[in-house]
């Protein structure tokens, strides 16, 4: 694995407040890394330090193996796209995309070729002569991306780039981002608070909370095995049950089934239905169950089996296969 950038014990304090707390992080070259976590966890602060917009209180940031902790942003060779696209309104789409190339004094003929190629890459070749304000949000987003990519950055940094788009477009642009990253082989670091976005896009996802890294790895490894309750909650796990030996287990609502008999392996709990919410293809069945230790735990089962007819007040059994019961460290 070639390393594009590295955080070594990087801390950022604002007065008494520690926004980023001694993180170590490796950004692999040619891959897409997401920094994922709730608001305030230090994602943007980390990205800004990587970009050079803020200097760590302590620790080092290496880019291509070179200590770049104090290198100014314009000398880091990075492309960046923010939540607000920050396009130049008085320039055409092509001029926006060519802006960084002009600054770098690329000859006009070559610049024209690179701009055309980059606009084709993001599917906007036909809008080269338009002004940004004539474009939809999704199109403006692509222009901002094209402008950042045109300079062939060592690292492409994206801060919540899709969060201003409506839900449908956002999902479409995820696929587009993946395609563009695969076609260009760029190293991308993306900040998001959206777990679905991180799961779908990442080669490596880094789950953060309160300035620390809780877990990192490929989505296929992190998702089925969250390191602790905080990561599990952030990834949409519910139904936390403590067993007699003190271990904490969790099951996703879609893996809890209504059954007529206890299953031998896995988890089975009995309880009373509190609520049934109809949601079209599925129903959310809320149950107050006995955890086997005399305590009541509230469980939610996402039931897709139309034959199940649970009603509030019914006593039912909820069960999950062993394969879907995740044991947490803490
Ligand atoms: P969000 O998604 O809301 O941007 P985030 O995970 O990106 O969240 P950061 O923007 O990195 O979080 O902020 C982390 C914490 O540091 C927050 O509590 C924020 O208020 C604080 N913070 C960030 N920048 C500064 C600053 N310049 N001065 C003081 N506090 C700051």
Where are the model-predicted features located?
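ABC ATPase nucleotide-binding domain
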Residues: 6, 26, 62, 317-319
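The feature captures the beta-strand-to-loop junction immediately N-terminal to the Walker
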Residues: 36-38
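Conserved ABC transporter NBD signature motif
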Residues: 59-67
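Non-catalytic connector elements of ABC transporters
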Residues: 247-330
